[in-house]
Amino acid sequence: MHYYSVHSVIFIVVILVLFGGMRGGFKLKLRPYNLCNAAQYTQQSYLILSNPFCLFRTIGAGSIEELNYFSEMELEEIFSPYHFPSDSLRYNLEGRNIVLFILESFSKEHSKFYNPDLYPAEDGYTPFLDSLMAEGYVFTNAYANGLRSIEALPSILTSIPSYKAPFVMLPQSLGNLEGFPTILKNLGYSTSFFCGTEKNSMFFEAYASMAGIENFYAKDEYMAECAVNENTIEPFWGVYDMPFFLFMADKIDEMEEPFCVTSFNLTSHHPFRLPSDYADKMPQGHTLVQPCVAYSDLSIRKFFEKSSQKPWFKNTIFIFIADHVSPEIYAPQTCYPRGRMAIFYFLYTPDKVLQGLDPQVTQQLDVMPTLLGLLGYDKPYFSFGRDVFNEPERFSIATSYINEVYQGIADSLTIYFDGEKVISAFAADDIFQKNNLLNNREVNVMERNLKAILQSYYQQLKKQQYIVPHDAVDRMSKK
């Protein structure tokens, strides 16, 4: 009996060790290691990936779809992820610093600036960001390309979408990649990422490394230098937004210009906890997330108060964009698929060089090409988005995968495509999607454009190539 008891205990211990080894640890917040984690240690990630690990992590990943809606020549005429910047630019902010705030669960519905009718007698939950929008360049029709945080980083930093599966989880993500941080690094920028969680809890560090970010500041870096107590550390995720943003401000002060800083906040994520010294000071909210959104907004205000007198501040482009819409929903229109993607997105420059309201459809994929255009970047680059200021020839359509179909959002129409045909279409102002316009002539044009994007996407996945190839540059030079 003793023999079997001992061996049973040994068996259980071995199983637990194997489980922890495959996950990469035992912490609740930790995501199991994936192929992209290799990018943290070398740019040649294939050199350190073992065959058994690759086999284990790719079982069930499925093969890449073969979409052949168009010939190669037809496809190139409709859509290409290869961008060749023009000589004439609407703005030239070359050499400016970049500070990019990726805002957790910042649905469009939280803002009174975006929704004055939703909050006729309230201030909304983002009063400080609303004040910046009043002086900034606001995209009033902006959309996320996914429903989860893990899908946001590839869309924003490398302009690559996720559809049926998060791009970062695909083995094909380990291809030739040149993200926005990589391009800026080649221009002499330092690149840093700030997120108050533990490293790799959401593959953030792994994908940030793939995208070209050199320096990663997380919970450990904060705890090594700053106060640790119940008002600074949230027990599940990591550092509360306010102390972490102030820590980020201090670190930025130490950087040489030009720099590119990306931050990803935590407090507006489930389980929606607030530090005790602010728990009773935030507005109650209509949903669980809104008091936390108000706290995150206040945290950004404190960051600006601390940084606004620093020498680097006036020479900086600030970008604010949500990672996705919160599952906590208040506005009726947010319940419908188009509204489930409607997010914050605006630019702010202290010298007011960028101001206005832009009603055209924009998406997370547009961040990288738009910023490259603002910085005067003149070399070819790879992107599934568009430079909203300098590429009027590219059609504007925000894409996503929701409810097992592809969604295409344009200025006047939203379509739903099952991979073979459009199954429904609705006018943009039909927010509750009651009147199906399936036979509308404009649907055919949108279907064609969406098919071209999807065919190009799956082709690039199969090639594992997310850069502009030399032959495309040669073809362009001959035109």
List each language-model region with its residue ranges:
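N-terminal secretory/membrane-targeting segments
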Residues: 1-96, 113, 119-126, 133, ...
